[in-house]
Curated annotation (Swiss-Prot):
Free-text function comment from the UniProt entry: Endonuclease IV plays a role in DNA repair. It cleaves phosphodiester bonds at apurinic or apyrimidinic (AP) sites, generating a 3'-hydroxyl group and a 5'-terminal sugar phosphate.
PROSITE patterns registered for this protein in UniProt: AP_NUCLEASE_F2_1, AP_NUCLEASE_F2_2, AP_NUCLEASE_F2_3, AP_NUCLEASE_F2_4
SMART domains on file: AP2Ec
Key words, A-Z: DNA damage, DNA repair, Endonuclease, Hydrolase, Metal-binding, Nuclease, Zinc
Protein name: Probable endonuclease 4
Organism listed in the record: Edwardsiella ictaluri (strain 93-146)
Swiss-Prot/TrEMBL GO biological process terms: base-excision repair
Stated family: Belongs to the AP endonuclease 2 family.
Pfam family, one: AP_endonuc_2
CC cofactor note: Binds 3 Zn(2+) ions.
Gene Ontology MF terms: deoxyribonuclease IV (phage-T4-induced) activity; DNA binding; DNA-(apurinic or apyrimidinic site) endonuclease activity; phosphoric diester hydrolase activity; zinc ion binding
HAMAP family to which the protein is assigned, alphabetical: Nfo (MF_00152)
UniProt: Zn(2+) 3 binding residues: 182, 229, 231
Residues at which Zn(2+) 2 binds: 145, 179, 216, 261
Length: 282
């Protein structure tokens, strides 16, 4: 079964996120468990935790259908020790928030070398950061998102994702989320079924579908291999709709959250309905 949804707002309380997802007729959703542009957040109260869990139960969402995203400020490969420690502390806090909420996944951007250390060193720092977080938390899988490779961001090549995973000690608690816009901007073609087949054959060989824990389904305003991260509504960007039809009909993408981060929230309900329909369309 495909779990299809969008990254919804938690404004007004975390329990509002599952309600908003339900209103979209989504079978999955993503959210931030705290303000994504601030380092610190007040600890979750028992009331907030209970309300979120109750809302998930009320609307039929289980942990495997929910893909929380961490703060944009966190850089687990930061070249400066003090800044790296700050990011690691914030990431551990986010992992613990997920555990408290009964969630089992935390999606994050791997990190950036900021042109100050080499790629290999940065990838090792990211893996060390994951190991530290896993050692201090329980029950939550660290889900590395591929990037577009904009600036000094790593994680835009499947080989980089594999290099991080190789250095993670507990392989049962690490996975990946593939963002279609990011992959396309990083040079992985998705414009037709043959291209999709080849791109995901590369993914299978290099990383492995056993590590796939979620996807972000976004068309791309940015050009192929541009290393620029610009999302677009489905079928209106440079990827086109063939990739999304292909994904919907491939059972390797069953049982994981497939999350829209497209640019017009007013179209999410229609996009979700269209994606659902592609599973059985001829």
């Amino acid at each position: 079964m495909k779990y299809i949804g969008a990254h919804v707002s938690a404004a007004g309380g975390l329990d509002q996120a599952p309600a908003r997802a339900h209103a979209l007729e989504a079978t999955a959703f993503a959210l931030f468990t705290k303000n994504q542009r601030q380092w610190k957040a007040a600890p979750l109260t028992d009331d907030a935790i209970d309300a979120f869990r109750a809302a998930c139960t009320r609307y039929g969402y289980q942990s495997q259908q929910i893909l929380p995203h961490d703060s944009y400020l966190i850089n687990l490969g930061h070249p400066v020790t003090e800044a790296l420690e700050k990011s690691r502390g914030a990431f551990i806090d986010e992992m613990q928030r997920c555990a408290d909420l009964g969630l089992t996944l935390l999606n994050f951007h791997p990190g950036s070398h900021l042109l100050q250390i080499d790629e290999r060193d940065c990838l090792s720092r990211i893996a060390e950061s994951i190991n530290l977080a896993l050692s201090q938390t329980q029950g939550v899988c660290a889900v590395i998102e591929n990037t577009a490779g904009q600036g000094s961001n790593l994680g835009f090549r499947f080989e980089q994702l594999a290099a991080i995973i190789e250095q993670v000690e507990d392989k049962s608690r690490v996975g990946v989320c593939i963002d279609t816009c990011h992959a396309f901007a990083a040079g992985y073609d998705l414009r037709d079924e043959a291209a999709c087949g080849e791109t995901f054959a590369q993914f299978s060989r290099t990383v492995g579908f056993s590590y796939l824990r979620g996807m972000h389904l976004n068309d791309a305003k940015s050009a192929f291999n541009s290393r620029v991260d610009r999302h677009q509504s489905l079928g209106e960007g440079n990827i086109g709709d063939a990739a999304f039809r292909w994904i919907m009909r491939d059972p390797r993408f069953d049982g994981i959250p497939l999350i829209l981060e497209t640019t017009d929230p007013g179209r999410w309900q229609d996009e979700i309905a269209w994606l659902k329909a592609q599973q059985t369309a001829e």
